[in-house]
Amino acid sequence: MLDPKHLRENFESVEQRLATRGGAVTLDRFRELDSRRRELLREAESLKAVRNAASEEISRIKDKSQAQPRIAEMREVSAKIKVLDDDLRGVDDDLQAVLLTIPNIPHQSVPVGASEADNREVRKWGEPPRFGFTPRPHWEIGEGLGILDFERGAKLTGARFTLYRGAGARLERALINFMLDLHTEKHGYEETLPPFMVNRESMTGTGQLPKFEEDLFHLDGTDYYLIPTAEVPVTNIHRGEILKGSDLPLSYTAYTPCFRKEAGSYGKDVRGLIRQHQFNKVELVKFTHPSTSYAELERLLANAEEVLRQLGLHYRVVELCTGDMGFSAAKTYDIEVWLPAQDTYREISSCSNFEDFQARRASIRFREDDKAKPEFAHTLNGSGLAVGRTLVAILENYQQEDGTVVIPEVLRPYMGGCSSIGR
């Protein structure tokens, strides 16, 4: 959520910057409600000043019978104040609802653009593998090895669900454990295991609600939603809290399954693991001081990149343009891994700085010291990594002509020493 004071005082510049995101971002309703709110406040405060002065005047009148007309007059003033206060509460509610629909302001360093075609490549690491044969897509490899069962996954639930079997299930588990070990033991994150369902307040805190309700799985008759990402529960760990400035940055990692309806993706990635209703992900979340949040974003990005480097997978980092960024982000880097069968890069991690946007929605603050005024923290997160897509990248990049798949060396201790997957 944007700071209403900053929005009010910098209305035109904020509106211009938000316009670079594309879409119908209008601030007219905010300006209308904010003006009405200030008008009501002025009226209410003026009447309260009159009432306070009258109260002092009445207290000085010794003959209380002479004070009755003034008391009756003040009853009318109090009734008007109550009406104004009620109106003000209604306007405050409407203003809050409007603020929840306004996206974050892109950081000045973010390139202006309309779509992913305008994203800026930052760097590449490694080289694509060279094959002496035509590389097969991961779904063919997985089915051929008997480790991915798409038909039975669909039978059990429906489209975009997969049954992992044997070495496929073990490889998924190996990746989760490898990522968590790397982030906790080397990068210094605290491991958490949050609930996989959260309430509406948590979804609102990170920005999924109210805008993206159609993409969420809601449990009928409850206030609970299945999480679309561990970002939601982990960021909300400190919702409504005041942290110690000396404790920042706080760095958390979590493995969770993620659940998404994938509304609007009909016909996209209909085969394989790229776009599923349920998938596993290891998430990285940071709570930082505003002055260090962009340095921490670079550190978080490097932590996510190291997963791919240790796995020996070629990738690139791109900086998203204003028109391709998520609703809550001020700046985002995507890490895209190379998939040889598709002859393209695919997103495997998105690393973002939200500045104080989520912290305002979730009331996450910190104090520099015991006497300091609380300030809003900055929140960051990124995938470290999407597990299913990492498995896809391993199957496609480490495939052999005979249909087997070599297991990256760093994963072999997690696979019981196994060096390859065969039929």
Swiss-Prot record:
Cellular localisation: Cytoplasm
GO terms of molecular function: ATP binding; serine-tRNA ligase activity
Record's keyword annotation contains Aminoacyl-tRNA synthetase: yes
The entry's keywords: Aminoacyl-tRNA synthetase, ATP-binding, Cytoplasm, Ligase, Nucleotide-binding, Protein biosynthesis
Any one annotated GO CC term: cytoplasm
Gene3D superfamilies noted in UniProt: Bira Bifunctional Protein, Domain 2, Serine-tRNA synthetase, tRNA binding domain
EC identifiers of the protein: 6.1.1.11
Residues holding ATP: R260, K261, E262, E347, I348, S349, S350
Enzyme class, UniProt record, top EC level: ligase
Principal location listed in the UniProt entry: cytoplasm
Metabolic or biological pathway: Aminoacyl-tRNA biosynthesis; selenocysteinyl-tRNA(Sec) biosynthesis; L-seryl-tRNA(Sec) from L-serine and tRNA(Sec): step 1/1
Record-listed L-serine binding positions: T229, A230, E231, E283, S383
GO biological process annotation, one example: seryl-tRNA aminoacylation
Catalytic activity: tRNA(Ser) + L-serine + ATP = L-seryl-tRNA(Ser) + AMP + diphosphate + H(+); tRNA(Sec) + L-serine + ATP = L-seryl-tRNA(Sec) + AMP + diphosphate + H(+)
InterPro entries on file: aa-tRNA-synt_IIb, aa-tRNA-synth_II, aa-tRNA-synth_II/BPL/LPL, Ser-tRNA-ligase_type_1, Ser-tRNA-synth_1_N, SerRS_1_N_sf, SerRS_core, tRNA-bd_arm
PANTHER family in the record: SERINE--TRNA LIGASE, SERYL-TRNA SYNTHETASE
Subunit record text: Homodimer. The tRNA molecule binds across the dimer.
Entry text on domains: Consists of two distinct domains, a catalytic core and a N-terminal extension that is involved in tRNA binding.
Family: Belongs to the class-II aminoacyl-tRNA synthetase family. Type-1 seryl-tRNA synthetase subfamily.
Known role: Catalyzes the attachment of serine to tRNA(Ser). Is also able to aminoacylate tRNA(Sec) with serine, to form the misacylated tRNA L-seryl-tRNA(Sec), which will be further converted into selenocysteinyl-tRNA(Sec).
Official protein name in the record: Serine--tRNA ligase
Annotated organism of origin: Geobacter metallireducens (strain ATCC 53774 / DSM 7210 / GS-15)
Gene: serS
